[in-house]
């Protein structure tokens, strides 16, 4: 103990007095990438990954999104055991087969699209959602097959279909097999349309490439989340190609709504009620009671 410590009254800590550090669990707080606010993770999850300070829509996992949409304990997964295979033996910096294993381990999913049937306020619904954490939500053979199975299920049970898109586009590691999914998914929607069943496409940030060029823009109603980037090529690629500066907000959902490319913009926290009301109108049914 130093001479200064002896002179200090008890209870007053000097700089060299050891202090007890409180351990804070990792991942308990998250910083908003838009406004910089420190957000309590449990509250952020309850708010569906939307910043309560500025309304910025952060990435949300596919299962969390679908859980927020469907009635509790009403869902059955479609094509759950379908998993990708490396038919082309593709290799870039890593083998495609290795990338699949890493993505499956990190996400706990077999591929980038989750499809389910269930109830929305007591009414039958089929819905699918991309998981961007799985290889950027890229569309390969399994994504296309699950989407087609979901559309077929909707036809079988006479239910509307909703898809939440969040993707960088076709999966390059599957080559032409991935590009074929653009036609496959569009054809599946054609069968759904023949029956007169509604298809609503919800575009989230980002929705680009082959996904935006196929089923993501084929909805009877196309809805986007606020400030979502939607387009085929990214703005930087376009600027480098045309050698011109793009308008501010180009390819964002607000710009697309203003120019008639989408029908509505909806906050994620209001999406369940909005979809329920729209599907009731499209199905010529009375709006369900608020639940």
From Swiss-Prot:
Domain of life: Bacteria
Catalytic activity: N(6)-carboxybiotinyl-L-lysyl-[protein] + acetyl-CoA = N(6)-biotinyl-L-lysyl-[protein] + malonyl-CoA
One of the record's GO cellular component terms: acetate CoA-transferase complex
Zinc finger (C4-type): 32-54
Keyword RNA-binding: no
Primary subcellular site in the record, as a coarse category: cytoplasm
Major enzyme class: transferase
Record's subcellular location: Cytoplasm
Residues binding Zn(2+): 32, 35, 51, 54
Keyword tags: ATP-binding, Cytoplasm, Fatty acid biosynthesis, Fatty acid metabolism, Lipid biosynthesis, Lipid metabolism, Metal-binding, Nucleotide-binding, Transferase, Zinc, Zinc-finger
UniProt xrefs under InterPro entries: AcCoA_carboxyl_beta, Acetyl_CoA_COase_Trfase_b_su, ClpP/crotonase-like_dom_sf, COA_CT_N, Znf-ACC
Cofactor names: Zn(2+)
Record's function text: Component of the acetyl coenzyme A carboxylase (ACC) complex. Biotin carboxylase (BC) catalyzes the carboxylation of biotin on its carrier protein (BCCP) and then the CO(2) group is transferred by the transcarboxylase to acetyl-CoA to form malonyl-CoA.
Protein family according to the UniProt entry: Belongs to the AccD/PCCB family.
Full protein name: Acetyl-coenzyme A carboxylase carboxyl transferase subunit beta
Organism: Stenotrophomonas maltophilia (strain K279a)
């Amino acid at each position: 103990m130093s001479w200064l410590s002896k002179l200090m009254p008890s209870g007053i800590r000097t700089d060299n007095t050891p202090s007890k550090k409180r351990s804070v669990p990792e991942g308990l707080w998250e910083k908003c990438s838009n406004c910089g606010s420190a957000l309590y993770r449990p509250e952020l999850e309850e708010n569906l990954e939307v910043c309560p300070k500025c309304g910025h829509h952060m990435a949300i996992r596919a299962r969390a999104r679908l859980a927020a949409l469907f009635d509790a304990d009403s869902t059955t997964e479609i094509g759950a055991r379908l998993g990708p295979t490396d038919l082309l033996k593709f290799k870039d910096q890593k083998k495609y087969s290795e990338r699949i294993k890493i993505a499956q381990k990190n996400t706990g999913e077999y591929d980038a699209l989750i499809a389910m049937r269930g109830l929305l306020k007591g009414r039958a619904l089929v819905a699918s959602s991309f998981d961007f954490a799985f290889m950027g939500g890229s569309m390969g053979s399994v994504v296309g097959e699950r989407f087609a199975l979901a559309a077929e299920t909707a036809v079988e049970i006479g239910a509307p279909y909703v898809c939440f898109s969040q993707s960088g586009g076709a999966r390059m590691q599957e080559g032409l097999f991935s590009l074929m999914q653009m036609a496959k998914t569009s054809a599946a929607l054609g069968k759904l349309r023949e029956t007169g069943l509604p298809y609503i496409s919800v575009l989230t940030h980002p929705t680009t490439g082959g996904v935006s060029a196929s089923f993501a823009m084929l909805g009877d109603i196309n809805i986007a989340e606020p400030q979502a980037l939607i387009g085929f090529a990214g703005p930087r690629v376009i600027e480098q190609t045309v050698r011109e500066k793009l308008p501010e907000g180009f390819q964002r959902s607000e710009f697309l709504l203003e120019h008639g490319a989408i029908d509505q913009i909806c906050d994620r926290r209001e999406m369940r009620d909005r979809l329920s009301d729209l599907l009731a109108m499209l199905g010529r049914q009375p709006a369900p009671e608020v639940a």
